[in-house]
Amino acid sequence: PQAPILSRKMDDEKKERLRRAWAEATAGNRRRSREVKIGSVAIGAGHPVAVQSMTDRNTNDTEACIAQTGRIRQAGGRIVRLTTQGLREAESMRIIAAEVRRRWPDTALVADVHFVPQVADAVAAFADKVRINPGNYNDRGGSFEALLEKCRRSGAALRIGVNHGSLSPKMVGLYGDTPEGMVESAMEYLRICRREGFDRVVISMKSSNTRVMVHAYRMLVAAMHLEGMDYPLHLGVTEAGSGLEGRIKSAVGIGALLADGVGDTIRVSLTEPPENEIPAAQAITAHFAAATASEGTFRRGQEALREPFAYSRRLTASVGRIGGDNPPLLRSELLADEADALHDGRIAVIEAVGPHPVEEWREAIVRMDAAGDRRPVILKRTYPSCDRTELAMQAAADFGVMFIDGLADGIWIESAAGTPQADTDSIALDILQASRARMSKTEFISCPGCGRTLYALQDTLAVVKERLSHLKGLKIAVMGCIVNGPGEMADADYGYVGAAPGRITLYRGKEPVRRNIPQEDALDALIALL
């Protein structure tokens, strides 16, 4: 087997090879990827970025899943995923698939499999795509090569879906809980796919932490490029939450990659009815479709990314409370002397006015670095939309990557339509929080729910937000079940996780502190832990 490009202590030569590979793979408008068909939906190879969602009903409730699939399709989503945690659910999905194909024949169905390889083998016979998680696929035995053969015979595609919170013990032991571990987890399976001549493969590298997510996808693109692989990518931020905050967080992570032409299909995971995810995803893809359709090279300023795979704050001088090691500020937060510094040029404002704001901002920073200019940088852009959600998602998709990469010291969002400054300031703070640059409020990490969810997730999240939103800087996770729950909330201070029907386990950090308590007592018990 080929030696991994990654190692726990990667030397400078390997890092430089990966950096060059990333730059080469993203040199054009869009990363080149092969075409993969998921049922009748073609992704990769220049096809428009596809949007998708996942049902949140028990898969054995076939009528509810069929109805929900119809609502997703009506909203514009042609790829729909269902959870198949056991053979009973696999058989239920077979029934669902037959009816969905009768009613909506252009809809592709994806089976989501964790822990039980035998289920993956079963659904490969009728699903348009099978999703497996390398972190738990072999926990109970099973041959990956045999699954590939079943997919080959049926025409099913395969998604190798890596989750930051559920890496295998082997990968955690070799690389730690890191983007490197995520990438090597995927590459191990991709090398088998190539060896077996199976190329109907899609990969995802999801995390609830946008920095980790972006770094993992970038490193995967580079690692695949070095090994001559061009598989398409499915993008998403896990456990993004709900409402405007959830949409902003998804736009920050997904937009950071689409800005560099990376991504072939996306999901905006929201703790809301799944059909709500489709217009949110369409807003992101439309924003970048408009940019890439315009004239221009769309890839200048890459030199600003000195370290694409890890956070590295750009070195700037401090002027009052901005620049240096200070957290990024909003334009409206500048004090009188700092505002004077803005007007007399001691603070640089880089305003993007063209269709490619990330490119404009990066180019300007490259010029400043070349000139030895270490003034603090405030990024500025004016948006025409009068719709608050649209403005927020566009701004998040543009500004987020700049703060994920540590390239700016301040943010300035203007609205040509007269959106109140209080609203644009609130959006700016949410962007900074989503990009991990500055915490200004409680952060809620919550999964969208699926057929494994063990309680009324959306209602519970609403109550948790109502009672705990005043705890600035605290991260609280509300998770539907134990499959991704404990892992994907590893970044949280406290967690509320479904353990069994009507039962909740509470976590402090990564440790369970109250197990299997009645749901009606769980929120009060969580508050008592704080």
Predicted regions and their residues:
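Active-site mouth loops of central-metabolism enzymes
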Residues: 45-64, 83-85, 107-115, 135, ...
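Glycine-rich, proline-tolerant flexible connector loops at the mouths of alpha/beta enzymes
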Residues: 56, 74-100, 134-139, 201-210, ...
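Catalytic alpha/beta core domains of metabolic enzymes, predominantly
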Residues: 163, 171-313, 345-471, 475-478
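Hydrophobic or amphipathic alpha-helical targeting/insertion segments
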Residues: 106-110, 114-159
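Conserved, mostly hydrophobic/aromatic
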Residues: 51, 112, 160, 203, ...
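Short, acidic/polar
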Residues: 59-71, 115-121, 186, 250-254, ...
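Alpha-helix-loop-beta-strand connector modules within alpha/beta enzyme cores
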Residues: 87-111, 147-156, 220-229, 368-372, ...
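N-terminal amphipathic alpha-helix/helix-capping segment at the start of soluble metabolic enzymes
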Residues: 8-53, 152-153, 290-334, 462, ...
